Amino acid sequence: MTDSKGYAVNDLVWAKMKGFSPWPGRISEPPAELRRITVKKNIPVRCIFFFGSNNYAWIEETQIKPYQEFKEKLLSSCKSAGFKEAVQQIEEFIASPENFQHLFASEQDNRPDPDVEFNKLREGGTESGEETTVNNTSTPAALESVETTPVTAKKSAAKKKVRASLPIKLHVDKVVVFRSVAASTTKARAIGNKAKAAAALNDTSSPKRKRKILNDTAGDVSSLDLDTFSPVRRNVPVSHLLNRPTVARPATPEIDMTSVSNALQSRNIQASNLKFGFLGLGIMGCGMVKNLLNSGHSVVVWNRTATKCRKFQEAGAEVADTPSDVIEMTDVTFSCVADPQVAKELVFGNCGVMSANLVGKGYVEMTGVDPETSHDIAEQIIAKGGRYLEAQIQGSKNQAEEGTLIILAAGERLLFEECQTCFEAISRNSFYMGDVGNATKMNLVLQMISGVMLAGIAEGLALADRAGLQQKDVLEVLELTSMSSELVMQKGNAIIKGEFPPQQALKHMQKDLKLALNMAEGLEQPLPITAASNEVYKHAKRLGYGSHDSSAVYVRARF
């Protein structure tokens, strides 16, 4: 069906959303999540599929123009890379529409005809003589109403009149007839409402009034004559507005156990005679264990997902069933997991570190934790006769595989010396910083600086794109200035490519910012810029980018 302006499903158009240039799109059937969005009453809108970003949105008809007719005029309205990609995609769609059908899978082309469902709604209400209401969670609220006139020969004309006033055809999922089984107070309210409706009809001096079936506010249920009802969600889902151009997380390639990094080959490492354990084979852990094995160390590994241990077992590592088994089988155990909570679970949980005999055993915590967590673990390890060292790592996945990390250690000095051959295999420098807690504080300060700087890079490149500048040119100029660094160039290139391969997960960066803010809170040190950056990372994580690289914070800054 076409609307008053002649638009039909599959028509190609230019659609303008507030804050954006006119964008090439296609008139579409709204997907399920979009039909739940409340739109303004009596304003004709169309569901638009935007090319390039592959999202849907309701757009007012006044902001829609035919694609071919306005093509020459609007092609120069925006110079961003995303716009050019969208134009290229719509031209490819024109040439080969069958190649794009997978993008429209969320559209429900086989929905029942809205006119038929609307007629069923009206006929069911008048024949039963009882109140009817719509229980519809898949369409915008407050867009449908029925006249409270008696059933006469004018019924068909009234239907046409009501349907003509609707800006959008609705898919009525269910019609519920509420029987007279409620308490007397509910019946009285229903009777009172009907009496008011009848009085309004008898008043010939006023025009016919329409009674809304669903309230326009989508939150007030007091006007509905319901015996029972489910709570109405006040927060209407608007996730599609935030789910603008996103990318699927790139698959993490399996680590190549046969290759040896140039940095490791250039070092003359004499492997220690001690036996080392390693808990956690994540993004950073895999690279470190690989270098320990390639440098000749004897290693026992454990990971929550046992399948990750196979490659290391083939390369010469032993595999233990539980963390406590690793402690029993080794002299020194390294732990490198996701966050402080997981680190505590490994120590205090079932079959954890504390379940083993710790007398004379060394435990090295490499997880990014706060000073309080490190102190808690240290106290328990030492209380059972063990030795403790915190060894915080600075670097990325590539640096872990190359063996060029930075190690910040604090705790028992003798244990630090015993681990030197391991630190030589996985890092280019290791620093001993004294008492437990000093290394974690230093690490949080460095992570805070890195996170704030990365958020600034993301916002700068987002502004450049919005201003019509080429992000590649911005990065080339930036490389020539004193602001240039390896971090800036790596993250900048990742943003331009839009791939965000995980070097350091965004959720881990946000975790470190949160821990830095907690530490500052205890010291009464204000960190307003860090706090603002933390909110940006939290939003990006909320959009589903927590497991992507931290450079994916650009998605939040740009969209």
UniProtKB/Swiss-Prot annotation:
GO terms for biological process: transcription elongation-coupled chromatin remodeling. Residues 267-559 are annotated as: Dehydrogenase domain. Residues 108-125 have a biased composition (Basic and acidic residues). It holds the Pfam family NAD_binding_11. It is found in: Chromosome. Keywords: Chromosome. Residues 106-137 are annotated as: Disordered. GO terms for molecular function: DNA binding; NAD binding; NADP binding; nucleosome binding; oxidoreductase activity. NAD(+) binds at residues 277-291, 511. Its main location: nucleus. It comes from the Eukaryota. SMART domains: PWWP. GO terms for cellular component: chromatin. InterPro entries: 3-OH-isobutyrate_DH-rel_CS, 6-PGluconate_DH-like_C_sf, 6PGD_dom2, 6PGDH_NADP-bd, GLYR1_PWWP, HIBADH-like_NADP-bd, HIBADH-related_NP60_sf, NAD(P)-bd_dom_sf. Residues 9-70 form the PWWP domain. Nucleosome-destabilizing factor that is recruited to genes during transcriptional activation and colocalizes with a subset of trimethylated 'Lys-36' histone H3 (H3K36me3)-enriched regions. Belongs to the HIBADH-related family. NP60 subfamily. The PWWP domain is a H3 reader and strongly binds DNA. In the dehydrogenase domain, the conserved NAD(P)H-binding sites and sequence similarity to plant dehydrogenases suggest that this protein may have oxidoreductase activity. However, since the active site is not conserved, the dehydrogenase domain seems to serve as a catalytically inert oligomerization module. Binds to mononucleosomes. This is Cytokine-like nuclear factor N-PAC. It comes from Aedes aegypti. The lineage of its organism: Eukaryota, Metazoa, Ecdysozoa, Arthropoda, Hexapoda.
